[in-house]
A protein has these predicted regions:
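N-terminal [4Fe-4S]-dependent radical SAM core
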Residues: 1-45, 73-77, 85, 110-112
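Intrinsic-disorder-associated, low-complexity terminal segments enriched in Asp/Asn/His/Tyr and depleted
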Residues: 9, 14, 83, 317, ...
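C-terminal scaffold of the Radical SAM
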Residues: 28-43, 61-72, 87-107, 112-309, ...
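Local cysteine-cluster metal-coordination motifs and their immediate loop/turn environment
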Residues: 47-62
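Residue-level signal for threonine
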Residues: 76-79, 257
Length: 330
């Protein structure tokens, strides 16, 4: 969905490659970590790849098909963009089947009692509520949720509905990360983001109504056509929503993305380095003045609510990649 998030950046591999398996039966990324099978996994990342649109800057693994949007999200998206995704696909159920099977195996191999759990994408909130219930119930049954202190789900603003958010809260989700990116329609159009800027505020209100008060906003600066004035306007709007956390990334022209192709064709121009540095410095200054702790390059948390932890181990599970990393900050 977006180049996010506040706590976890997911690794990407060739979407066409399947993990190789050695004689001990573990996928290749886990071969060198078999010795930690008795250790506790402190952080877990799950990847839900479905999207109904590929944003031009995004290089994350995703499956783009209008059929992936469930009914309520489809209606919201069609009102905003004129596109009309259809009802939930059967493949969502198949995906959840396989994800549950893999989590079951991982729970057998590792002590899978994470303190932090992050579900990214893709657009995780395109999974229908019934599939979310299946996944959450399975994780509860496997004991994965018993030690979780922070359970984040990534969402595009237009997919946040009260029934779905209530389902997530009932399953233990206590944090949402919203892909706002910008509040300027022209800049959203440059990024090929379909949502209405007003949908971010609506999503924040919906999350809070459902009981989620820990809210992150993802934003991007150094967007082609952005000025210091529009950057300030984005900061003003973001802060008006009183998030507990902000992730602010500079736009990266990743290889093999539509944005990079547009750059090569002269359709967009990248920000000059000096202006980009000035924008970053301005973000740092504004957020410090607003009471945010700058604890990582692109991440800020409110000082009164921040909790920083260094993970001893984190397991990332997603289509085409499984990875175990050490000493990651969340």
């Amino acid at each position: 969905m977006s180049r996010t998030s506040s706590t976890v950046d997911s690794p990407q591999k060739d979407a066409g490659s399947a993990p190789s398996v050695k004689s001990n039966g573990l996928p290749w990324p886990l071969q060198d970590h078999a010795a930690v099978s008795a250790a506790t996994i402190d952080g877990l990342y799950l990847h839900i790849p479905f999207c109904f649109h590929k944003c031009h800057y995004c290089d994350f693994y995703s499956i783009v098909d209008a059929e992936h949007a469930p009914g309520e999200a489809a209606e919201a998206a069609s009102q905003i963009s004129g596109h009309s995704p259809t009802s939930p696909p059967a493949r969502a159920a198949v995906f959840v089947d396989r994800l549950i099977a893999e989590l079951t195996e991982l729970a057998r191999l590792f002590t899978l009692h994470p303190r932090t759990l992050f579900v990214g994408g893709g657009t995780p909130t395109l999974l229908p509520a019934d599939q979310w219930r299946r996944l959450l119930d399975a994780m509860k049954g496997l004991g994965i949720l018993q030690r979780v202190r922070e359970f984040t789900v990534e969402a595009n603003p237009e997919t946040v509905t009260l029934p779905l958010t209530q389902t997530l809260v009932e399953g233990g989700v206590n944090r949402v990360s919203l892909g706002a990116q910008s509040f300027q329609p022209a800049l959203l159009a440059t990024l090929e983001r379909w949502h209405d800027p007003a949908s971010v505020g609506a999503a924040v209100r919906t999350a809070r109504e459902a009981g989620i008060t820990n809210i992150n906003l993802d934003l991007i600066f150094a967007i082609p056509g952005q000025t210091m004035a529009t950057l300030d306007a984005d900061l003003d709007t973001a802060l008006s929503h009183a998030p507990s956390h902000l992730s602010y990334y500079s736009l990266i022209f990743e290889p093999n993305t539509a944005m990079t192709q547009r750059l090569k064709m002269g359709q967009v121009q990248s920000m000059d380095e000096e202006t980009e540095r000035e924008m970053y410095a301005h973000v740092i200054e504004r957020l410090a003045a607003a009471g945010f702790e700058h604890y990582e390059v692109s991440n800020w948390a409110r000082k009164e609510s921040s909790e920083f932890k260094v993970q001893s181990s984190e397991l990332r599970n997603q289509p085409s990649a499984t990875d175990l990393n050490s000493e990651l900050r969340t």
